Amino acid sequence: MEPFSCDTFVALPPATVDNRIIFGKNSDRLYDEVQEVVYFPAVVHDNLGERLKCTYIEIDQVPETYAVVLSRPAWLWGAEMGANEHGVCIGNEAVWGREEVCDEEALLGMDLVRLGLERADTAEKALNVIVDLLEKYGQGGNCTEGRMVFSYHNSFLIADRNEAWILETAGKYWAAEKVQEGVRNISNQLSITTKIAREHPDMRNYAKRKGWWDGKKEFDFAAAYSYLDTAKMMTSSGRYCEGYKLLNKHKGNITFETMMEILRDKPSGINMEGEFLTTASMVSILPQDSSLPCIHFFTGTPDPERSVFKPFIFVPHISQLLDTSSPTFELEDLVKKKSHFKPDRRHPLYQKHQQALEVVNNNEEKAKIMLDNMRKLEKELFREMESILQNKHLDVEKIVNLFPQCTKDEIQIYQSNLSVKVSS
């Protein structure tokens, strides 16, 4: 399988405005995979010895898990990207290198994303959670639903209100880079070179034993663990370089809207089209002022250029995200038994979005009407969120239903577009 999949970005002061950290990710997956946006509340687990069912394996549960909002392929337990109630955001990428990928079922990188969010209240603690689980349970297993086998190692971009971490893995070996200012992005290649803040204790010795490092030159993680001919990975390296250029183009003035425009960029390949396409997108505002709420925007639909970024804010008693939640099927039946039957996982928003796109694809006038209405809704939402951040006022009663109501407003645009008459 060719290395097509995802781009994740972070921008920190002084690259951003208003002392905010901005996180963004495009999830690039198979064209027919549905991604849902779901919320799970915080839970105290009183049952000592409780076991947790992840996508393929069971692991030990912890005494307490935090509230999380996730954007995830609807067939699995983990997530491609998400955030928790403490302002921690994580996105993962598929990476390949010299260390052989294991098809044996273990924790998926997407499981590790969710576990990091559920168990950590800072970015570095999330890194600790992930590397500890990686050591204990390993990573591996098919990352797609159905007959096709698609396995990979993972890199992660983890951010909170104060800093970001890049964590890149090769089997059980890993390196981590701390990011405290400026911009950083990851794609489908190892990108940590000599700036290593933390690492697996045997990472260098293993590379030396394998003949990947002579023990004399300054250790370069990407050079040691990447394929000999990384030039063959032109697609991922191209997107990585293009993403870096786009971030630096706006350096000093990056806002959440800037990040959305980067995710919508098609010439760079960041907004991907084809067999693998951008199935969902996420952008988060993480104010360094802890009195301000973190705001997380999700699309829940393919192609951010033709989707609406809808805001989510953590408050008590969040309304269920029914319109972006897929029908439930037993993982035991469909994943554990390796069923080749792919059920219809389309949630209400996805269904209306796809129906509307089918209508407008061959009708430029309808397409313009729909897109104009989508951007109008988005701009209204952006103004409301900016007002919350500037005025430091949060109407909790309204916020509990914020994301569900935005989703209903988006669905109404698609329904109206399906019935609107245009001039001949």
From Swiss-Prot:
The modification Pyruvic acid (Cys) is found at residue 6. Signal peptide: none annotated. The active site is at 6. GO terms for biological process: detection of temperature stimulus involved in sensory perception of pain; proteolysis. Pfam families: Peptidase_C69. The keyword ATP-binding does not apply. GO terms for molecular function: cysteine-type exopeptidase activity; dipeptidase activity. Residues 1-5 form a propeptide. Coiled coil: none annotated. It comes from the Eukaryota. Transmembrane segments: none annotated. This is Secernin-3. It comes from Homo sapiens. The lineage of its organism: Eukaryota, Metazoa, Chordata, Craniata, Vertebrata.
